[in-house]
């Protein structure tokens, strides 16, 4: 793992954003997971700065190969992520535009459903916390298309590398195949397992590996 990924994991663990529990956490899918990541707890200036810095490093990581003009944050959770991350990118010497959508289309003033930079004719990367079913991302993809943007990638905080209820592939893999674009995450389940192997007890690692064996994507 790269230093920014290790820092991100440590901050998440230290602030109970990444949690582990022997009895597990019930997910929306109904599965009982030994870990839970709650990005909504990056809710202070310091923590949001650390989160956006991790996103920025992931964007600039050559291995992720992002090429874009505008960072798009889907309403509502993606809005602060887009704004904070372009600030972090600027601090690291890369100046990019940001944009986000309104849930309710404005019919006065400048009107429209987009706030921030125009998407027309520009390469766009979507930023979000996680991809569960992919529904919210698909809605964002349609907004970008209608606004004349060209979607080139998606970045999320965590890839659970977990099969959906409908298939043996993950939501991220499905989006990659469906949209034929670059989809990346700051960290993956594999990264979490490697991190816990060095920082937490053997029992936690065994629970994570058992969960991955049961629900993880193959290959």
Please give the residue ranges for each predicted region.
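Active-site-facing substrate-recognition patch
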Residues: 1-65
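Active-site catalytic pocket residues across diverse enzymes, especially alpha/beta-hydrolases
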Residues: 63, 89, 93, 148
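Short glycine-rich phosphate-binding loop at a beta-alpha junction
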Residues: 65-75
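Structural detector of well-ordered beta-strand residues that form the stable sheet scaffold
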Residues: 71-72, 99, 152, 184
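Gly/Ser/Thr-rich loops at beta-strand to alpha-helix junctions
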Residues: 75-81
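Short, glycine/charge-rich flexible loops or terminal/linker lids adjacent to PRPP-binding catalytic cores
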Residues: 83-124, 138, 203-206
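A contiguous pocket-lining binding segment that forms or flanks enzyme active sites
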Residues: 114-158
């Amino acid at each position: 793992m790269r230093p920014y990924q290790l820092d991100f994991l440590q901050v998440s663990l230290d602030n109970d954003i990444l949690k582990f529990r022997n009895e597990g956490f019930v997910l929306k899918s109904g599965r009982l997971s030994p870990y839970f990541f709650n990005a909504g707890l990056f809710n202070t200036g310091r923590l949001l700065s650390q989160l956006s810095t991790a996103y920025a490093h992931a964007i600039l990581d050559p291995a992720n190969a992002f090429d874009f003009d505008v960072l798009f944050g889907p309403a509502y959770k993606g809005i602060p992520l887009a704004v904070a991350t372009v600030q972090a990118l600027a601090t690291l010497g890369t100046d990019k535009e940001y944009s986000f959508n309104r849930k309710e289309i404005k019919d006065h003033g400048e009107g429209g459903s987009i706030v921030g930079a125009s998407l027309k004719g520009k390469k766009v990367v979507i930023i979000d916390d996680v991809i569960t079913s992919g529904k919210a991302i698909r809605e964002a993809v349609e907004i970008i298309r209608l606004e004349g943007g060209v979607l080139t990638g998606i970045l999320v905080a965590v890839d659970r590398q977990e099969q959906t209820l409908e298939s043996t592939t993950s939501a991220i893999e499905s989006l990659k195949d469906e949209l034929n674009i670059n989809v990346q995450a700051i960290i993956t389940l594999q990264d979490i397992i490697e991190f816990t192997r060095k920082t937490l007890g053997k029992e936690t690692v065994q629970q994570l590996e058992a969960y991955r064996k049961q629900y993880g994507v193959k290959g």
